[in-house]
Amino acid sequence: MHTLLDLRGSIPAYIHITDGKRHDSNELDEIVPEPPAFYMMDKAYVDFLSLYRFHEADAYWISRPKDNMGCEVSDHRQDFDTSTGIFGDFTIRLTTHKSKKLYPEPIRMVTYHDSETSNDVEFITNNFEISALEVANLYRHRWDIEVFFKWIKQNIVVKTLWGYSENAVRTHLWVAIIAYLIIARIKADYKSQYSITEVATLIRISALERVDLRDLITKPKNPIIQNQNVKELTLFDDF
């Protein structure tokens, strides 16, 4: 299930359900880039012909380089703070005959040290305007798609399929997606401070109760604060 998630509301803007034979890199051909949006994607989706189409449309993309990507450094920047985790900001050009023909323009490569995992991570992008740290932080949002898939798996019962035909599986997945969108709309309409997962849980555990939906999914404006100065009686107050 290939999904383009709009980070402004964690809402799927594009979904394409395919079989496992279709390669991820072919999926970019189905997406119409919207300038000046940023598209963060896993390196499995990197296809330089499609990425150049995004570049020509004035849309920005951020991904990670594949292990076999041939390139050479043509320039480097030094206007970054290494204490933020940034250790390199380079301008590169592709060197393999096919790649440089598909993407003839320079590409930016940022090297980031993740202190949590102690790993060095490289990012590639066609944007040369934002800071190197912003490139790394934007790519972090790619993991929001994993949260979406986790929600689909945990909150909608797809473990037991209704059927094993292609049509049955597609129908089951679309029902799960529709349920997600309905809950997201409810959350937005009532301006709930709870996450989509929390809203779904509250609705599920209260399904058989007569309760106002707004009251259920909105947090009280003035939460009750217990008086910590009240002296509680003990078993030994009389002694």
List each model region and its residues.
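Single, function-defining residue in the core of a domain
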Residues: M1-F239
